């Protein structure tokens, strides 16, 4: 199995204020799979995503990628792995304001020894004609496309998406979801997406529903639908 999550536990605080955010999660995600993590606020989905990405550490349990445990990696190797093999897309775009679209994407390319072709990616993103613009000259959707480009140009094994459409309107959200779908299908990256939008589950290969720090449902979609057909 490509991504193996075993017995992951995480809590915050101590004593009477201690909150168990993750309560012993087990999950397998296949290479190239599009997995959606669903759940209400406080269910632990973003914390799980951060642990997969090495941003936070678990209190107990293990995460292995292609058989290698993240906990066994020394800090330098873990940092290199995050830079080279993980791509992050957040609700906030976090673009470098004084760099153009192209330059923002090239920042990601510099971190990889196997980057995608920037020109080809700009065409895929629908940004080729906007590549010389600065972030403040872009719409919200264009800024998020640029952020996706910066994440995917590294050709990461895993693309981690935390509410990537949370700050966007309906039409722009669908465009971004179609783009992430295209990236997953074209480049074969494993996608793990956190969302509170229940409709997005219908485009996923795997759906994992969390509540109170536990997995309540975990199933594969037999008849997933394209992002363009989603409605909410």
Language model segments and positions:
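ABC family nucleotide-binding domain
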Residues: 2-204, 209
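Conserved beta-strand-loop-alpha-helix hinge in the C-terminal portion
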Residues: 214-232
């Amino acid at each position: 199995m490509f991504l193996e999550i075993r017995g992951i536990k995480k809590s915050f605080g101590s004593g009477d204020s201690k909150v168990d955010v993750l309560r012993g999660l087990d999950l397998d995600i296949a290479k190239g799979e599009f997995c959606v993590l669903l759940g209400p606020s406080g269910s632990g989905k973003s914390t799980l995503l951060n642990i997969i990405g090495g941003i936070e550490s678990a209190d107990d349990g293990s995460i292995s990628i292609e058989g290698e445990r993240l906990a066994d990696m020394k800090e330098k190797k873990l940092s290199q792995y995050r830079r080279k093999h993980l791509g992050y897309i957040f609700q906030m775009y976090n673009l470098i304001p004084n760099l153009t679209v192209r330059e923002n994407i090239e920042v990601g390319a510099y971190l990889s020894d196997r980057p995608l072709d920037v020109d080809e990616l700009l065409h895929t993103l629908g940004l080729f004609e906007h590549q010389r613009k600065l972030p403040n000259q872009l719409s919200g959707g264009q800024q998020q496309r640029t952020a996706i480009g910066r994440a995917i140009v590294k050709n990461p094994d895993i693309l981690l998406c935390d509410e990537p459409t949370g700050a966007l309107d309906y039409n722009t959200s669908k465009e971004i979801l179609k783009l992430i779908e295209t990236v997953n299908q074209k480049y074969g990256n494993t996608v793990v997406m956190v969302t509170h939008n229940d409709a997005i589950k219908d485009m996923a290969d795997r759906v994992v529903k969390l509540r109170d720090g536990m997995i309540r449902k975990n199933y594969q979609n037999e008849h997933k639908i394209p992002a363009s057909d989603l409605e909410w």
